[in-house]
Structure formats: structure tokens, C-alpha cells
Amino acid sequence: MPNPNHDDSPIQNPMNRFFNLLFLLTTATTTAFAQADIQKKIQTDLIMADDGATIDLPAGTFVLASSLSLQDKKNITIRGAGADKTVLSFKNQSEGAEGLRVTNGQNIVIENLTIQDTKGDCIKTMNVNGITFRNVKVEWTGKPNQTNGSYGLYPVQCQNVTIESCTAVGASDAGIYVGQSKQIVVRNSVAYHNVAGIEIENSIGADVYDNHAYENTGGILVFDLPDLVQKKGGNVRVYNNLIENNNFDNFAPKGNIVAQVPAGTGVVVLATNQVEIFSNRIINNKSQGTAIISYFMTEEPIKDSLYYPYPSQISIHDNIYSRQLVPATYKGRMGMMYRFKLRFGKNVPDIIWDGIVDEKAPAAQSPICLKNNKNAQFANIDAGNNFKAISRDISKVTCELPPLATK
């Protein structure tokens, strides 16, 4: 028997479907306009902000189509409702590369928000004196892929940089990257599923401490590279960090310098001067707990006449090392080196030095000094002589350098 409360007519059901579809289309259109409105409002606030202003972003997930920018401002705070509450998604980005770009500023604070899935870098700041990232998450939400943006947090050519209580996930170069900058603090932050978790490059005066770098290709990198505006970095301290299980396959695009970092890397110092690595726990990084290498290991040509390609005054002390008895990676160029030249098998040393030295430097002082590193095995791999005289004698590099000055 037909239900008197239910209209089964052939006309009514199609009409219901029509109105339902119309409702959905209207809702979607309204949502799209709302997202466009929030993009316009945020960008307008960034443009119109007076020096000293705070720009508050509401809670919610907002899908933005183009980059946001702030320039030529002083004493500005950009504040979300919380890293898990204010989410700016650039998944369908059609204009620009960065999520947020800040240039030519002074005393800028970015805090309590998340930026996701940008075409390029999540947040880039350039020529800013006094930049603070606090409780910020930057991430690519899909599987790690070389099409992900290069950098999560990316201050470059900045001074007085503070990165604290931040999280970086999925960068195809470095999750937290500080380049060509001066006076830097990176602390209480987390980086995982990046090629490099944290990278300090061509920068002067950096403290990297109380961070957790795990499940990256390489945990913490301290690099000096040629052909950059700021030629020589140094005075970098890496301490009180947990650097563990950085065995993630390298997914950097070919040609990037970090594409050469082997999976299973805890810390790498490349051609940098005055680096102190101490009081860290460097655990289960299968290829190299800590590596100290010259730029010659990259086999890239050096065209910059002012570039110094050797590491020097590298102090590694009072760290705790531990690793499982597993082979190093056999992938990539470095993997081939492990397999056919070094042949460590499962007994991979925790600390590896390429052994390439500047013949013009004073012979009396080793460029690296190791002391009081618990459970640490060492190898000088004699890379400059085609690995002919690999030595695991740690006594030749057991020495002490003066502590670097605190900031």
C-alpha cells in the first residue's frame, strides 16, 4: 500500500533532486566566494598594516589560490588562533610560489598557524632584521615527493632569526632552512619526512638546540657553498638535540646539493668553519651519525675564487651515539661509495671524516677534534687518495678546541 506521507510521483522525485543539486551548487559557490574573500582580506591587512600592528587570522582551514606578501614593514605580528586551528592551504595554488613572503622588514613575528601544500616554499623571509617563527607548522600533506616545495621555513639574508616550537614536514630540500643569515636560534622544533630536517647554510652565529630531527634523509646539515652572496659561514653550535632514525629515502630533485645526502645521515658538516657539536643523542642513523666533509666530496666544479672548500675547527664532543648493526645505504653515488670503496658492512662508523685537508694549513692542528663521545666509532676514509688508507684510529683526532662563544 502506498505511504500517504511519501510522495512517489515521477515528478516530485526529480524536482527534489534538482533542488538538492541547486543547494549544493549554491553552497559550493558561496564557499568559493568566502575563500576568495578571506584571501583578499588577509592580503589587504598585510598591505594596509601600520608599523606595530598585529594581524589576527581566525580559526579555520582556508584554501588560498595565490601567495601572500608583506614588505617594508616594522614591528608586525601575524598571528593565527593556533597551529592546529588556523590552516592556510595552498593545495590549488595558481599564482606565486610561496605561501607567505616577507621582505625588507624589521621585527616581524609569525606565530600560531599552519601553512600547507605550497608550490614552492611555505614561508620565505628575505632581508629582515628580527624575524621570529613561533608555533608554526609547515607541511606538504601528501607522500614525500620531489615536486614538493624546497623549503618549509626559509629565512635568507636575514639577521636575528628565531625559530622556536615549529614543525616542518615533507620539504624536498630542507624543512627548516636558514641561509646567508646572521645571529640565529633554532630551538624546540621538530622536523620529519624532509630531505634535510634542519639546515644552516653560509650563516654566521647559529645555535641549534633542543630539537627533534627524525625520519628525514639527513637530520641536521651545516653547509658552506660557493657562488652565494654571503661567502663564509661559521660559529655554529649544534647541541642538546635528538637526531634519530634519519633513514628516509632521498627524494630531492636531481641537481640539488642535498640530493647527494645519503639516507641514514644524522649530522653533516660540509666545508664550514668553527662548528661545535655536543651533548646530542645521535641514534640509529644507518649511514653516518656525523660526517665532516670538504666540498670536493660533491665532485662539483668550484668557480668561486673566494670560496674555501675545507671544513676547519670542527669540535665534536660529549655526544651519545648508538646504531643498529645494519649496512649503510647502497643507493645513490654515496651508496656506491659505501658498497664498493668503504665496505664497512654492518660495522659502519658513527663519525666519518673524508680526510681531505688544506695542504697550506698548519700541519700541527687537526681540522677536527673529537672527545668524550659515548659509543662512537670513527673513520678517516682517505677520500683524497681514492680511499686507499682508510683509518679507524681515533687517537689522531682526539683533541680539544675552545668552546664557541654563546650568544
Regions found by a protein language model. Give the residues of each.
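Acidic Gly/Asp/Thr-rich repetitive segments characteristic of extracellular carbohydrate-active
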Residues: 33-58
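Long, ordered, amphipathic alpha-helical scaffolds
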Residues: 259-263, 294-397
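Right-handed parallel beta-helix/beta-spiral solenoid domain characteristic of secreted/periplasmic
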Residues: 35-40, 72-119, 142
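Extracellular beta-strand/beta-solenoid scaffold signature
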Residues: 42-43, 65, 91-101, 117-124, ...
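Short, T/G/N/S-enriched strand-turn elements that build extracellular solenoid repeat scaffolds
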Residues: 42-48, 63-72, 78, 89, ...
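Parallel beta-helix/beta-solenoid
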Residues: 50, 72-74, 83, 104-105, ...
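Sec-dependent signal peptide recognition
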Residues: 16-24
